[in-house]
Structures are given as C-alpha cells and as structure tokens.
C-alpha cells in the first residue's frame, strides 16, 4: 500500500512540474531538432549535420539530466516581483522555445541555399514536424538530399588588358581553383 502511495505522490509531483502546463493551447514546445542527410553523396564530400545546424533558425532549450530544468526554472519566477531570487531564476532559466512554422520553413530554405553555395545545386531540403506527443511537444526533422556536387571542368582566361595578363598568368600556379575540384 505504501508503494502505491509513494508512486502516486511521485506522479503528482512530476505532473506539477510540467513545463508544458503554461503553453497556450495549439502551441508546442520545441523538444528536438535533427538533421538527416541521404547517404548518396560520398562521405568525404558530404556536408555534415554539424555544418548544417548553424542554419537552423530555431533550436530547443538546453536540457539538464534529460529534463527541461531551465524552462521550469524560468517559469517558477514570478514576473510581478522584482527581487534577487526571481531575477536569478529569470537569468539562469530559459524562456520556452515554441514551434514557429515560419521559422521552420525558413530554416529549410537556409539549408537549401547553403548546400547550393557549397556546389550541391541539385540539393533538396524538407522538414517534418511530429506533434503527436500528448504533452504538447514538437520534434522537427530536416531531411537533406545533397546529390552530386558540381565540379570545375576547365579554367580559361580572356584578358582585354595585356598588362593584367602578365601579372595574373604567372600566379595561376598558386590559385585554389583547379579542374576537378568541387565548385565551392
């Protein structure tokens, strides 16, 4: 009997600490963002997920021991009181990051633009949002297809000024642009 009571009390306390309690109806706490790349591009030429993460506009809150401790701490602060304890909670805590579909779409566009600038002109970036969780949490998965990178076929120079030709042509051995390299 005491075990059942202990489990019930623990369950009650955990539900009282829910960070999604104050989230408005129809909104979702951004829980996780992942980037998945297809494996069709060779590994040494593939853009890593770590490079792509910089272009995602929304990132989830920090976690502590698998919990949203920082969001919980932020929500425990009383906005009506201005004392050092509430100020400390607001300073250490983090405001909850809510899913914003316009930022999610913009992030997919940013990923596509970045892959284009790296020479992957036939790339694609899509996203999928999972809001099926009963606790008003959202997970976003970005899927990228990089394809084959474009390569530099040949290099030719067309000089109108002979003076510039005498300066540039002897220095072409030091150029970083070479035939066969990825157009980046």
Map each language-model feature to its residues.
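C-terminal motif of bacterial Sec signal peptides marking the signal peptidase cleavage site
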Residues: 13-16
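Interaction-mediating elements
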Residues: 18-184
